[in-house]
Swiss-Prot record:
One of its GO terms (molecular function) is 4-hydroxybenzoate polyprenyltransferase activity. PANTHER family: 4-HYDROXYBENZOATE POLYPRENYLTRANSFERASE, MITOCHONDRIAL, PRENYLTRANSFERASES. This is 4-hydroxybenzoate octaprenyltransferase. Gene3D superfamilies: UbiA prenyltransferase (1.20.120.1780). Keywords: Cell inner membrane, Cell membrane, Magnesium, Membrane, Transferase, Transmembrane, Transmembrane helix, Ubiquinone biosynthesis. Catalyzes the prenylation of para-hydroxybenzoate (PHB) with an all-trans polyprenyl group. Mediates the second step in the final reaction sequence of ubiquinone-8 (UQ-8) biosynthesis, which is the condensation of the polyisoprenoid side chain with PHB, generating the first membrane-bound Q intermediate 3-octaprenyl-4-hydroxybenzoate. The chain crosses the membrane at residues 37-57, 101-121, 142-162, 169-189, 219-239, 241-261, 271-293. It is a multi-pass membrane protein. GO terms for biological process: ubiquinone biosynthetic process.
Amino acid sequence: MSHPSTAPAHPSRLALYARLVRIDKPIGTLLLLWPTLWAMWMAAGGPPGWTLFWIFFAGTFLMRSAGCAMNDWADRDFDKHVKRTKERPLTAGLIASWEALAVAAVLALIALALILPLNALTKWLAVVAAVLAGTYPFFKRFFAIPQAYLGIAFGFGIPMAFAAIQDQVPFVAWLMLLANVFWAIAYDTAYAMVDRDDDLLLGMKTSAITFGRFDVAAIMICYAVFLGLMAWAGSLLGLGWPYYAGLVAAAGMAGYHYTLIRERDRMKCFAAFRHNNWLGACVFAGTFVAYLLK
């Protein structure tokens, strides 16, 4: 006796929206969160207080999620030609373009609402951060190294943290933001190496394409500059040996990444990108212990 075939269940709208904002892929949120946490501890001279911590934690998650939705909307005509992205909900036709924009707008508005109790400087910087997040996807069309712009967008929690805690953005905050730009170029170039062949066919601009055969060397130079600038920031703040131990551990992580990317294998390059979460964690651990013992 034959049984009637059962049609595969379609994912719910909520599940599709969760995929749109990469709920299942938290690496982007973590790469946004670590620099923000470094800055919060440095600005406060230790733990910043739970209220501020949760405001920035939630804001980071929401803005990264909004950025993912905005990115998919901006790249909807390109992603269908890239193996890694062609199954995304918007590209696959499972949700409409207006839905992606609506999700991005709602999440961004919630994130902006979170900072209403904070001072005016932080609010103005939040507006700048929102503009950076919303415009980044379009820089890949014409800017040779869009990863530098990404580094500014992903690191803007640094000046915001100093503004929220100190009501000013001192030199050390901008120094750390510059350091974050080099870190972002390093990890996102490894990420761009995964899609380089597809991006070349589509005429997209990425640092992996711009650096060409010097891509691995460029990544390692960016790691070195990042660590050097962070060491400078630590000296300006008078941080002790645990902070520098964290930077040494981060340097060890960068060395490990070299072993992954040197052959330019796609899967290993992607692994190096994901592993930057632990590099960021090393810097935070050093910062945390340095203030704990100060």
